[in-house]
From Swiss-Prot:
Residues involved in a ubiquinone binding: 201
Listed name of the protein: Cytochrome b
Keywords, alphabetical: Electron transport, Heme, Iron, Membrane, Metal-binding, Mitochondrion, Mitochondrion inner membrane, Respiratory chain, Transmembrane, Transmembrane helix, Transport, Ubiquinone
Membrane topology: Multi-pass membrane protein
Family named by the database record: Belongs to the cytochrome b family.
Listed transmembrane segments: 33-53, 77-98, 113-133, 178-198, 226-246, 288-308, 320-340, 347-367
Function, in words: Component of the ubiquinol-cytochrome c reductase complex (complex III or cytochrome b-c1 complex) that is part of the mitochondrial respiratory chain. The b-c1 complex mediates electron transfer from ubiquinol to cytochrome c. Contributes to the generation of a proton gradient across the mitochondrial membrane that is then used for ATP synthesis.
Additional note from the record: Heme 1 (or BL or b562) is low-potential and absorbs at about 562 nm, and heme 2 (or BH or b566) is high-potential and absorbs at about 566 nm.
Protein origin, superkingdom: Eukaryota
């Protein structure tokens, strides 16, 4: 009798994706982040579901309902902090996953890469609308500032902002629709992740060398299932350390003050995972220019396959490109730091230099360096 996992219509799909999937024998721990993102998404959906049972999306009661969850609901505090810090873990895994793709040339899988960029945008949108829900000072002013950026779009900008707000300012209508968006988007993310995997399994995984690995494949189970479980255990350990010992480490103290439209906080800033983009936005003194730079900073990922001029796929054997890659990482860390600083000297000029360097490395230096390395191969 044939094994049920190979014949049953549903089990067959699971089997081909997670059990009998032929995987390269040499993929490193940098390939763990895909499964970790899946775990993060499931964790966020589950904790979010339980939070939604007790949350009310009304300006009068939203802040109180979050307080009620933390104080009165059984284990509400741990669910709330797992959800808040789970978002941070999600973004850490996302940035590592994208960084891995850039370093090892995984962007040559065009469909997989482009769906991935769409996923990144969707997760960022979800995190943004989610941050508004507790209705603290930073929630309210973050929502006001970021949605206001759309008014920079010529002709339709103002109408667009008022349409999103559902009125002439961030108010009850805004909070209610943001809750609706925050509830539906994770399921859209889950669907997109399925498509992401579908396209990946059309080609098979990349590997650190960037060389086709068809001649040397091993089954996903047990080799990579056990490896993924180790990654998941480490992720959960790190998340629970955050949740149980420093739950507010990555949050903003201003968000423990209820939203007040009449009182602007001295420094409006988003969560840490948006600070690099926020720094790029602030480094341009023109509103529309800033918005374009902000969008371009993420959208530039779509251009990566076009900017790939090297004869080698991976950076594994390209020391000059490796140096540039790590300079880019350092630049992004600098931008993240600048995004959380006040708008004054010397932070303004550092932010502007870091923003220019970010685009210059990706658009100019990387393709030139790859071409130089191609010529060095002839020596």
């Amino acid at each position: 009798m044939t094994n049920i996992r190979k014949t049953h219509p549903l089990m067959k799909i699971v089997n081909n994706a997670f059990i009998d999937l032929p995987a390269p024998s040499n993929i490193s721990s940098w390939w763990n982040f895909g499964s970790l993102l899946g775990v993060c998404l499931i964790l966020q959906i589950l904790t979010g579901l339980f939070l939604a049972m007790h949350y009310t999306s009304d300006t009068m009661t939203a802040f109180s309902s979050v307080t009620h969850i933390c104080r009165d609901v059984n284990y509400g505090w741990i669910i709330r902090y797992m959800h808040a810090n789970g978002a941070s873990m999600f973004f850490i895994c996302l940035f590592m996953h994208v960084g891995r793709g850039l370093y090892y040339g995984s962007y040559t899988f065009l469909e997989t890469w482009n769906i991935g960029v769409v996923l990144l945008f969707t997760v960022m949108a979800t995190a943004f609308v989610g941050y508004v829900l507790p209705w603290g000072q930073m929630s309210f002013w973050g929502a006001t500032v970021i949605t206001n950026l759309l008014s920079a779009i010529p002709y339709i900008g103002t109408n667009l902002v008022e349409w999103i707000w559902g009125g002439f300012s961030v108010d009850k209508a805004t909070l209610t629709r943001f809750f609706a968006f925050h509830f539906i988007l994770p399921f859209i993310i889950a669907a997109l992740a399925m498509v992401h995997l579908l396209f990946l399994h059309e080609t098979g995984s990349n590997n650190p060398t960037g060389i086709p690995s068809d001649a040397d494949k091993i089954p996903f189970h047990p080799y990579y299932t056990i490896k993924d479980i180790l990654g998941i255990l480490l992720l959960v350990l790190f998340l629970m350390l955050l949740v149980l010992f420093a739950p507010d480490l990555l949050g903003d103290p201003d968000n423990y003050t209820p939203a007040n439209p009449l009182n602007t906080p001295p420094h409006i800033k988003p969560e840490w995972y948006f600070l690099f983009a926020y720094a790029i936005l602030r480094s341009i003194p023109n509103k529309l220019g800033g918005v374009l730079a902000l969008v371009s900073s993420i959208l530039i990922l779509i251009l990566m396959p076009l900017l790939h001029t090297s004869k080698q796929r991976s950076m594994m054997f390209r020391p000059f490109s490796q140096c540039l890659f790590w300079i880019l990482v350092a630049d992004l860390l600098t931008l993240t730091w600048i995004g959380g600083q006040p708008v004054e000297y010397p932070f303004i000029i550092i932010g502007q230099l870091a923003s220019v360097l970010y685009f210059f490395i990706i658009l100019v230096l990387m393709p030139i360096t790859s071409t130089i390395e191609n010529n060095l191969l002839k020596w």
